[in-house]
Amino acid sequence: MKIAVLGAAGGIGQALALLLKLDLPANSILSLYDLAPVTPGVAKDLSHIPTSVKVEGFAGTDPTAAIEGADVILISAGVARKPGMDRSDLFNINAGIIKNLVAKVAEVAPEACIGIITNPVNTTVAIAAEVLKAAGVYNKNKLFGITTLDVIRAEEFVAELKGLPSEDVRVNVIGGHSGTTILPVLSQIQGVSFTDQEVIDLTSRIQNAGTEVVEAKAGGGSATLSMACAASRFAIQLVHALSGKQGIIQNAYVDGGNPASPFFTQPLLLGKNGIDKVLPYGELSSFEETKKEEMLSVLHADIEMGIDFVSKTLAAEVS
């Protein structure tokens, strides 16, 4: 199995590459790509770690060598948030990066599963889908917005509040991957109860956790390490599912036929071809149902922004 990381020299990319080198199944190939000339050196550094995962690194403007034959392609390339920015502020730069990289994936590795990490995920996944459609290779079962960071934050914050081991807490997080579109379904957590105020405070903290990190780093970066952990967790499970392991369920932001929104984060049963089945996200409390309805206009606008971007740029290229 070959796994490619595009944006591998960045804060998320390097940490993600390390985790994948440690945790991918034996004899996997880990292929790293970035514009930065340091990328082959990152691969060389990782290659000294004693695991049976082969690492290769590529730098420059053409990612072809990195993605040829890849089964899974993880895209973290782009600029990171700085204080005062939200994920939508990243759009103008990151939209073009995603469009160009996904266009190359469509050309070189059209059968690969693609995991989008680059923010704003609500929009960049829609961009990726439109690019793949334009190339005639779109498979909705193989395109994922990686939102696992919202899940691991929710699980950690609940465990912290209730004095529980983090590994014993499971939280279903639905919706999108920014601000109010992130909806932790706290009412479904087994064996844990919350006051109304705890639900309000926890929901807000989970939704704004990215800002919490950006501000704490005081201009020195965003949530690179926890995002790398989350992306690795998702990618490893996806690799296991592609290899035939059954019963693997992960949440991700996908084109899953949800009547609420063209793209929506919800539980997925993964299989040998990507998404095997989109699972229902279950019953919501009245608070959660209200929050879901309130988020939809934001989510729809984020998606339309991505669709419009691709439509306009493709039209400009033709003219």
UniProtKB/Swiss-Prot annotation:
PROSITE patterns reported in the protein's UniProt record: MDH (PS00068)
Instruction: Identify the domain of life.
Output: Bacteria
Q: Transmembrane helix: present as a keyword of the record?
A: no
Enzyme kind, highest EC tier: oxidoreductase
Pfam (any one):
Ldh_1_N
Q: Which GO terms describe its cellular component?
A: cytoplasm
What is known about what this protein does?
Catalyzes the reversible oxidation of malate to oxaloacetate.
Q: How does it assemble?
A: Homodimer.
Q: What is this protein called?
A: Malate dehydrogenase
UniProt organism field = Psychromonas ingrahamii (strain DSM 17664 / CCUG 51855 / 37)
Biological classification of the source: Bacteria, Pseudomonadati, Pseudomonadota, Gammaproteobacteria, Alteromonadales
